[in-house]
Amino acid sequence: MDSVPRDYSKRVYQGVRVKHTVKDLLAEKRSRQTSNTRLNGSVSSSQPPFIQMPGSPVMSGYYGVRRSFLSDSDFHSSKQFSNDLYTSGMSKPFACESTAGQSHTGLLESYLAEPYGDYRPPALTPTPSSLFSTSTLPPLLPPPFPSDPTHFVFRDSWEQTVPDGLSQPDPMPADALQSLPPSTSCLSQLESGSSTQHRNMGWGASLAGAQSYSLHALEDLHHTPGYPTSPPYPFTSFMTVSNDLPPKVGPLSPEEGSDVSSLHDPSPWTKEDGSMAWGSYECRRAY
């Protein structure tokens, strides 16, 4: 009982505002009355929750007033209820979590086992003929080793035409070159060569062999003795050759004639680095 007057004197001494000090005094009286009437010998245990903190006398006094209305029996009963709630709640969620975790894992395993365990392995384990016979997959080359049928080489859509272009070049320029009479102009042949170059330059650097073959054929045609130095340019040669460049019908100017005469020199075709590009650009400039 000695601690109560000390707290009382402290609160009176620390109180700055009269309203809060009166409320604190009333709260102390009520708390002492309730503690004396309902509890015997537990005053020291019931008093610490209502001790005012010295740092903030006003607010702690206000909260002390609010807390002093709760009786100790209610406080202990709520404490006990909270303990029961925590113990029962903690024991039940653990059990629920264990059962829920098992049920969730079981459900997930059942759901995952159906699409991934039952349906996908049959799709991956049939024979290669039934698996790769779908139209969405690219066609397969024959296995490189006849004794080992498991080596399959995939072939992309853009790779299908590259070996064909290497093994079998475009027959149209060769037929046109063979079918042309000896009186046709060199410009038409160069033009057909430029068209083949324009077609072959799209394949990339892997087709340098095919381009070099067409160039060698043009060089051989240049050195044939049956070509006139300044022949007339008939319009039938432009119609018979299938080329990508549009034909220009009309007389040639002297500048264009000089450019065309420079085409007879095989020096641009023997360049090592830019022979493809120089030949195609000179043919276009001649046009």
Curated annotation (Swiss-Prot):
This is POU domain class 2-associating factor 2. The gene is Pou2af2. Keywords: Activator, Cytoplasm, Nucleus, Transcription, Transcription regulation. In the N-terminus possesses a conserved OCA domain for bivalent binding to class II POU domain-containing transcription factors and to an octamer DNA motif (5'-ATGAAAT-3'). Belongs to the POU2AF family. Residues 10-32 form the OCA domain. The keyword Transcription applies. InterPro entries: OCA, POU2AF2. It is found in: Cytoplasm, Cytosol; Nucleus.
